[in-house]
Amino acid sequence: MMEERQSPVSGENHLPDETSEKRTIRPVKVGSVLLLFFLLVIWPLSSYLLMKGQQPQLSATGSQGIDLSTQIYLPTILIELFVFLLITLVLRLERESFSSIGLKGFDLRNLLIGALFWFGMSLFLMLTSYLLRSYNLSTSPDVLRLLPRTTPQRSLWIMMATSASLAEESAFRGFVLTRLNLYLKNWWLTILIASISFSSGHLYQGTAGAFFAGIYGIFFSLLFLWRKSLVPCMTAHFLQDVTPLFSPLS
């Protein structure tokens, strides 16, 4: 799965099994490099600071102290959509297709694989959480106060989960993995960097929350390299994000 094979680099050929040591070095594209820096550094840092800035107010007053819809959910949705628009803009400027970042394979098989992946990962992380608790590495309790309380809030939460599954998978799996590896030429290093960046944006959830996000990032990356499609990753990501609506302790 992780081996490189020959194929020219264009369009869909950014995907994992289609690189080659014998091809000519791909010229640096400024748009891709700037977007990689934004996705790997700026976005995770800004997400962390945004959520961290709300925690003192959450700790002091609970969810009643802030308007979850306007201060958390809507800003998050807008940021996710902005990121996806940036990816779209860079793809258009560089004359690339959405399929070049894995936005293809919208079929029942990939949907089912994504659902099964989510179920398996949920069981794995549930068992892992018991080990983390023994070392007092629990998720920040303030995070639970971000969960919706009303029907309109739940609707926004679902919209937020949808936008996150689209934007974050397109960014950290689709764009970062395919573009960064063109320069690093090492899938394991590429996966590690992408997963650390993905994890750092979840530090506001505490050590355990960031750890789980990093683990998810690694397995999402492997799933993407296997299926060469973001559909299973987006499906699993969406299910993971909406699960707290039915089981807050998850």
PLM features: residue spans?
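Functionally important transmembrane alpha-helices
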Residues: V41, L45-K52, F198-S199, A208-S250
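N-terminal, membrane-interfacial amphipathic/helix-forming hydrophobic leader that caps
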Residues: M1-S100, L245-S250
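Membrane-interface helix/loop boundary segments of multi-pass membrane proteins
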Residues: A167-I193, L222-S229
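Hydrophobic/aromatic residues in alpha-helical transmembrane segments
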Residues: F124, T128, S163, V176, ...
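Juxtamembrane helix-loop-helix connectors linking adjacent transmembrane helices
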Residues: Q55-Y73, R95-A164, L182
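Hydrophobic residues within alpha-helical transmembrane segments
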Residues: L78, L116, G120, S163, ...
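Active-site His/Glu-centered metal-binding helix of metallohydrolases
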Residues: L166-A171, F175-V176, S200, Y204, ...
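Hydrophobic alpha-helical transmembrane segments
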Residues: V33, Y73-L74, L111-L116, R154-I158, ...
